[in-house]
């Protein structure tokens, strides 16, 4: 696939000095401007770096105007951008300026070489499944959203009691601090710290991971991604729903949360020498 219109999206993680990120984005823009590409700069990024000679576009419109998006930031930036671009389906390249870089996997030290490889067609396409979440209250949908990483139902200060069913089959009632429904992508995020398994991103599977369960026999389980997961609130004092750790929605005792595999996917492009297991080994400090 040939890419002509390239969108540049930047984010400023707290760990990165503003002038360092400015320089990184400006260098990337200057590098690409020497080639035969039409550049589009996400409008907040443009205001930050003060380069005005290129088209500025709101994030929500980039998918309709660009062929590909290059994101300079961390995994959180990738998550937010992915949800914004999901309807248009344009692929993404992630340059890591955050902490981990499970999604934004290109190293900023050699980003020009890696980006040029991808833009010249020397890449592997990594399609990631999304999950769709709907909150029902009195049998009406009151909230819905896509997630690339996970959906988390979490209590406030006290335990929450949840009833979990899969494909209309009762699984269990659990008392815990909450529950995580994770995509394979999300299994290296919150679900991993809660004791869940790592699922390869090409698996068509989801994981259900309890958070600090009261009964130690409540263990994480992995299920087919085409399953429908229904979670009912049995008892709570306060609780909320979190989408990718970025969107928070307050829950009520009457609510039922339904999680299913979304029909849409997102695509991350990697250079040909990318290896998922090498990435895990480096990020998780395996031997």
Language-model segments: what does each one mean?
Residues 1-68, 80, 109-126, 135-144:
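ATP/NTP phosphate-donor binding region
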Residues 8, 71, 181:
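Redox-cofactor binding/interface segments in oxidoreductases and associated redox assembly factors
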Residues 13-14, 75-77, 98-100, 185-187:
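Short glycine-rich anion-binding loops that position phosphate/pyrophosphate groups of nucleotides
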Residues 71-75, 82-84:
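N-terminal glycine-rich "phosphate-gripper" loop used for MgATP/nucleotide binding
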Residues 88-106:
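Short, acidic/small-residue loops that bind anionic groups at enzyme active sites
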Residues 100-177:
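Catalytic core of DAGKc-family lipid kinases
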Residues 172-217:
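Gly/Ser/Thr-rich active-site loops/lids in small-molecule metabolic enzymes
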């Amino acid at each position: 696939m040939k890419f002509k219109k390239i969108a540049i999206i930047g984010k400023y993680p707290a760990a990165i000095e503003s002038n360092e990120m400015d320089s990184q984005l400006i260098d990337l823009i200057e590098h690409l401007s020497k080639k035969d590409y039409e550049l589009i700069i996400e409008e907040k990024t443009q205001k930050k770096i003060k380069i005005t000679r290129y088209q500025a576009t709101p994030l929500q419109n980039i998918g309709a105007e660009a062929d590909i998006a290059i994101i300079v930031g961390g995994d959180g930036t990738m998550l937010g951008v992915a949800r914004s671009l999901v309807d248009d389906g344009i692929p993404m390249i992630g340059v890591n300026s955050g902490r981990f870089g499970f999604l934004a996997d290109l190293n900023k030290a050699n980003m020009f070489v890696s980006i040029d490889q991808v833009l010249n067609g020397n890449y592997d396409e990594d399609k990631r499944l999304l999950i769709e979440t709907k909150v029902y209250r009195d049998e009406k949908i009151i909230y819905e959203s896509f997630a690339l990483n996970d959906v988390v139902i979490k209590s406030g200060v006290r335990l929450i009691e949840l009833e979990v069913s899969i494909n209309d089959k009762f699984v269990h009632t659990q008392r815990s601090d909450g529950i995580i429904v994770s995509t394979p992508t999300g299994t290296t995020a919150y679900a991993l710290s809660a004791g869940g398994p790592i699922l390869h991103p090409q698996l068509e599977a989801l994981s259900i991971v309890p958070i600090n369960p009261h009964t130690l026999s409540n263990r994480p389980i992995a299920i087919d991604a085409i399953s429908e997961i229904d979670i009912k609130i049995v008892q709570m004092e306060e609780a909320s729903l979190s989408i990718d750790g970025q969107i928070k929605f307050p829950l009520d005792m009457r609510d039922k949360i339904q999680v299913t595999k979304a029909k849409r996917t997102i695509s991350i492009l990697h250079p040909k020498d990318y290896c998922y297991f090498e990435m895990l080994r480096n990020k998780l400090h395996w031997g």
